Curated annotation (Swiss-Prot):
InterPro entries: Rotavirus_NSP1. Belongs to the rotavirus NSP1 family. Residues 1-81 are annotated as: RNA-binding. The keyword Phosphoprotein applies. The C-terminal region is phosphorylated by host CKII/CSNK2A1. Phosphorylation of the DSGXS motif is essential for host NF-kappa-B inhibition. The keyword RNA-binding applies. Residues 82-176 are annotated as: Important for cytoskeleton localization. Residues 317-486 are annotated as: Interaction with host IRF3. This is Non-structural protein 1. Plays a role in the inhibition of host innate immunity by inducing the degradation of key host factors required to activate interferon production such as IRF3, IRF5 or IRF7. Associates with components of cullin RING ligases (CRLs) including CUL1 or CUL3, which are essential multisubunit ubiquitination complexes, to modulate their activities. Recognizes the host NF-kappa-B regulator BTRC through the presence of a DSGXS motif in the C-terminal substrate recognition domain. It comes from the Viruses.
Length: 486
């Protein structure tokens, strides 16, 4: 049973402010949403369950019940999830404001406790203090948070998350910020709250408090393509595809970590709520995470035998060849940019092999084939450079003045010629390892310049950033026929 969810349900009834702030989709009428098998904690209601993707950032962090309100931790509206979200440097004052917000929304005094106990005892057979009947009173104030890093910005989503040892398939990791605050000060806050509870409930409260306030922070996770909506991943092969997201917005102050202070001024809070509206954004899929996914898929479909072949057609246009024909039914080939990169990389590699090694036909079994498997995934820089070095060494370079050279006297297509001229200024007849690396990088960077790409898509930007980019029309990609270089 989700403690935070129960606390919101019961405390929502005590006043007008709580009724507005503690309204959760999981406690209201359920509206169906796409079912998924991603396990983790819903950031909105803090329960561990199956998650669906958020309409604000396309990541999996909301349950199918809470998704009806479309709340995202990156919103610009002072809903409870946003007020519990802190960013980058979190100070002791910020945490004091958070504790004050918890104390305001979930007050614990004799009057409140007696009221909840009396309401519970009106039901049949509920005269005893059983934990499940008073779960809402057993939520301690902790500085437990789920954290994520998105392109240099670190976000902390505070809450009370049960069962921390459960399966977590999200990019969020548990972080404990109690040391920034003060353990003894937080102990005092909770012991005071606990003193109003019946003795039979105090032990359970104490156990929950210490288990959630003394844990060791987890190592931060890396965001990967699997953390985003499957609907987005299935459309990445379309260069003109745009992600459609919605954000809840209002005239909220630019002081990100100060949003939780709004509950101290009820009139100011409701005035800001009056400005609430939804903004829609059309976002490009261009980012390192999605680009690497496409290049990895293409890498699994590589037919390395082409680099020793005599085919007159480009690598993706070879048909009826047992060793060189690719499986064109995969949707990754619908992206003409991936096909261009594949064709030009293998055209260049074939020219290198034909210039330096005596190999006559694509049916021959060569050791160099093993080196070509990772040649498209330039995002994994170390592994990619290792592959290029192995290919270069296979060509049996000649050493001259402490520099190794290979020949380059085989024909290449016009696209590769243009890359040669742009990258090293001419069409050479000998190449160094550095030249080969530069040329192959240029072939890929012409379409996917990963050096200057964001790691995650712009769906993970704050509303302020999205608005600035929208003003300059930069939230959408270039026309599908234009490369990064152009």
């Amino acid at each position: 049973m989700a403690t935070f969810k129960d606390a919101c349900y019961y405390y929502k009834r005590i006043n007008k402010l709580n009724h507005a702030v503690l309204k959760l989709g999981v406690n209201d009428t359920w509206r169906p949403s796409p079912p998924t098998k991603y396990k983790g904690w819903c950031l909105d209601c803090c329960q561990h369950t199956d998650l669906t993707y958020c309409r604000g950032c396309t990541m999996y962090h909301v349950c199918q019940w809470c998704s009806q309100y479309g709340r995202c931790f990156l919103d610009n509206e002072p809903h409870l999830l946003r007020m519990r979200t802190f960013k980058n440097e979190v100070t002791k004052d910020d945490l004091m404001n958070l504790v004050d917000m918890y104390d305001t929304l979930f007050p614990m005094n004799q009057k409140i406790v007696d009221k909840f106990i009396n309401n519970t005892r009106q039901h049949k057979c509920r005269n005893e203090c059983v934990n499940q009947w008073y779960n809402h009173l057993l939520m301690p104030i902790t500085l437990q948070s789920l954290s994520i890093e998105l392109d240099g910005d670190v976000y902390y989503i505070f809450g009370y998350y049960d069962d921390m040892n459960n399966v977590n398939q999200t990019p969020f990791s548990f972080v404990n910020l109690v040391d920034i605050y003060d353990k003894l000060l937080l102990d005092d806050v909770n012991f005071t709250r606990m003193s109003f509870l019946p003795v039979t409930l105090q032990q359970e409260y104490a156990l929950r408090y210490f288990s959630k306030s003394r844990f060791i922070s987890e190592q931060r996770k890396c965001v990967s393509d699997s953390h985003f909506s499957i609907n987005v991943l299935e459309n990445l092969h379309n260069p003109s595809f745009k992600m459609q997201i919605t954000r809840n917005c209002s005239e909220l102050s630019s002081d990100w970590n100060g949003a939780c202070k709004l509950v101290k001024d009820t009139s100011a809070y409701f005035n800001i709520l009056k400005t609430s509206h939804v903004e829609f954004y059309s976002i490009s899929t261009r980012c390192r995470v999605f680009t690497q996914r496409k290049l990895k898929i293409a890498s699994k479909l590589i037919k390395p035998n082409y680099i020793t072949s005599n085919h007159r057609t480009s690598a993706t246009e070879v048909h009826n060849c047992k060793w060189c024909s690719i499986n064109s039914s995969y949707t990754v080939w619908n992206d003409f940019r991936v096909k261009k990169i594949y064709d030009n990389i293998f055209n260049f590699l074939r020219a290198l092999v034909k210039s330096n090694v005596n190999v006559g036909h694509c049916s021959s079994q060569e050791k160099i084939y093993e080196c070509v498997e990772n040649i498209l995934d330039v995002c994994d820089n170390e592994k990619w450079k290792t592959s290029v070095t192995k290919i270069f060494n296979y060509l049996e370079p000649v050493e001259l003045n402490a520099v190794n050279y290979v020949l380059f006297n085989h024909e290449v297509n016009w696209d590769v010629i243009n890359v040669l001229v742009q990258s090293i200024g001419k069409v050479p007849q000998i190449l160094t390892l550095n030249d080969v690396t530069t040329i192959m990088q240029s072939i890929i960077y012409e379409w996917f310049d990963t050096k200057y790409m964001r790691n995650t898509p712009m769906t993970t930007f704050t509303v302020d950033k999205l608005r600035r980019l929208c003003t300059g029309s930069k939230t959408v990609d270039y026309d599908s026929g234009i490369s990064d270089v152009e």
